[in-house]
Regions:
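Acidic/polar-rich alpha-helix caps and helix-coil junctions
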Residues: 1-148
C-alpha cells in the first residue's frame, strides 16, 4: 500500500509559531496566528488577548486546561492562559495524528485512561512509561533499554 503523510501542515505550523510568540511574550502576534487558525476552523470567531485571558484564566475544565508540569518556566497569568489556549487548539488540530504525545511529554501532562470495571490507569509525570523505548535491534546490539 502507498500512504502519503503530511509532515507539516500550515494549520499546525501556525499554532507552533503562535506558541513561539507566546514564549517571546509577543501576544499580539500570537493572537494573529490563533485568529488565522480559527478563520479556517471556527468561522465567525473573533480572537483577542482579553478573550483568551478571560476564557483560559477561568476555572479549569478537563478539556480546556490541564495541570502542567514542564521542566521550564511558564509565568502564571497571561502566558499560562495563552499556553493553555495553544494546547487546546493543538489537541483539536492533531487529534488523528498522534502529535498530542509530544505535548503530553513536553508539558508534563498527566493522562488518565478509564478501564472497564471502573478502574483507571494514570500516566503520572514521573512514570517511566513516558520514555520512548529504544528500538529492539539497538537493544540487541547491546545498548541498555530504557527502564519500564
Amino acid at each position: 500500500a502507498h500512504i502519503v503523510t503530511t509532515a507539516f501542515t500550515t494549520d499546525e505550523l501556525l499554532l507552533c509559531r503562535a506558541e513561539a510568540f507566546i514564549y517571546q511574550k509577543d501576544y499580539d502576534r500570537a493572537v494573529a496566528d490563533i485568529q488565522a487558525w480559527c478563520d479556517t476552523h471556527a468561522s465567525g470567531t473573533t480572537v483577542s488577548r482579553s478573550a483568551i485571558n478571560q476564557y483560559y484564566g477561568s476555572q479549569a475544565t478537563e478539556r480546556t486546561k490541564k495541570d502542567l508540569h514542564p521542566k521550564f518556566v511558564i509565568e502564571n497569568g497571561e502566558q499560562l492562559n495563552f499556553v493553555n489556549c495553544i494546547l487546546h487548539l493543538r489537541r483539536i488540530e492533531t487529534v488523528h495524528e498522534g502529535l498530542r504525545w509530544f505535548d503530553i511529554k513536553r508539558y508534563g501532562i498527566e493522562v488518565t485512561h478509564n478501564i472497564s470495571g471502573g478502574n483507571e490507569d494514570v500516566l503520572k509525570v514521573d512514570d517511566l512509561r513516558r520514555a520512548i523505548q529504544i528500538p529492539t535491534d539497538v537493544i540487541g546490539a547491546g545498548l541498555t533499554p530504557n527502564p519500564r
